[in-house]
Every structure is written in C-alpha cells, then in structure tokens.
C-alpha cells in the first residue's frame, strides 16, 4: 500500500462520514416542509417494513405541508400510522386518498434544542473524520516500520491527510452553521 492509496482511502472514508452527517441533518425538522423528513419512515407493507417512498408519492402541498399519496387505497391508514409513530412530532391528516402532513411551527425552546442536537451531531462527524486521520497515520507508521516508505514520505503523507482532515472539518462546521441558521429562521 502506498502513500497515495492511504490518502485516497482516507479521503473516501472522510467523505462517507460527511455524507452520513448530511443524512442525519436531513432528519432534523425545521419549520419548513421537505420530503426528506419522511425518508427514514418505515411502513408495514403486508408484513414487511419498507421505506415510505416505496409505497407512496411524496410531494409538497405548500411551504408547511407535505402531501403523501399511497399507491394503494388500503395502505392509507398504514402509511398514516407509520408517519405518526415515526417520532417526528408530526400529526398527519387523511383527506380521502391523500395524507396531508402539516409542519407545526417550532417553539423557541424547541429551536434551541434542535441547534444543540445539530452541534452534537456535528461534533460526532468531526470525531469520525479525525478517527480516519488517526487510522491513516497508523498505516503510515506501519509502512515506515516495515521500511516500505521513508520518514519523509510518512511526514508528507501525514501532512496531506491533515489537510484533508482540515477541509472536511471545515465542511462540517459550514453545514452546522447553515442548519443552525435554517432552524433559527422563523
């Protein structure tokens, strides 16, 4: 394994950490409606749990309402129950074959709680990125010990991985700041 391989592997792992963090951020409810909020909702479809997107069309009725239209009439109550049980603080209402999910406005207290959650998840993402850096540095040390690379190459590799770490940590900070702003905007 070369310095370039370790760097490439570290970059891919760091990107996966950022992608996972972005997915976590999408689940944090702001005052605005977006279909991504329901992405992780699982519906009981004839005995097996499937994502809501596989049994219904998701759309936006307006800025504060998600509309969910199950493909089968008999799935309406199961989809509504799944949304209610998803622990998102949402109260869906069925109108014929369409389920409307209004976004209740967030209280100031709830907004502050959500910003704490976002910051905590941001710290977790930074820790994940730093763990990748630590693993890469350990691989460099092992290569030096095995005399596969020189100490200069090790230092160069560690510097490059540190630059990657700085870049990804800055991206996490940027995402946290954007989400905080989105949450605190009334």
From Swiss-Prot:
Keywords from the named record: Cytoplasm, Protein biosynthesis
Localization per Swiss-Prot or TrEMBL: Cytoplasm
Keyword Cytoplasm part of the UniProt annotation: yes
Cross-referenced SUPFAM superfamilies: Ribosome recycling factor, RRF
Gene Ontology CC entries for this record: cytosol
GO biological process: cytoplasmic translational termination
A GO molecular-function descriptor: ribosomal large subunit binding
Domain of life according to the entry: Bacteria
Family statement drawn from the similarity comment of this UniProt entry: Belongs to the RRF family.
The protein's role, per its UniProt record: Responsible for the release of ribosomes from messenger RNA at the termination of protein biosynthesis. May increase the efficiency of translation by recycling ribosomes from one round of translation to another.
Name listed for the protein in its UniProt record: Ribosome-recycling factor
Organism per entry: Ralstonia nicotianae (strain ATCC BAA-1114 / GMI1000)
Highest classification ranks of the organism: Bacteria, Pseudomonadati, Pseudomonadota, Betaproteobacteria, Burkholderiales
Gene this chain is encoded by: frr
């Amino acid at each position: 394994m070369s310095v370039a391989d370790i760097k490439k592997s570290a970059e891919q792992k760091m990107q996966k950490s950022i992608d996972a963090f972005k997915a976590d951020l999408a689940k944090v409810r702001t005052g605005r409606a977006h279909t991504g909020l329901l992405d992780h909702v699982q519906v009981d479809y004839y005995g097996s749990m499937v994502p809501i997107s596989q049994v219904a069309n998701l759309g936006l009725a307006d800025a504060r309402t998600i509309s969910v239209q199950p493909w089968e009439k008999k799935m309406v109550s199961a989809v509504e129950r799944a949304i209610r049980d998803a622990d998102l603080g949402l109260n869906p209402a069925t109108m014929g074959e369409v389920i409307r999910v209004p976004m209740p406005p967030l209280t100031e207290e709830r907004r502050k709680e959500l910003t704490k959650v976002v910051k905590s998840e941001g710290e977790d993402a930074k820790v994940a990125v730093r763990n990748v850096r630590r693993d890469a540095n350990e691989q460099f040390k092992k290569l030096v010990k095995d005399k596969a690379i020189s100490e200069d190459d090790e230092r160069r590799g560690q510097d490059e991985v540190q630059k990657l770490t700085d870049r990804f940590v800055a991206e996490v900070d940027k995402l946290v700041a954007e989400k905080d702003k989105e949450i605190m905007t009334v």
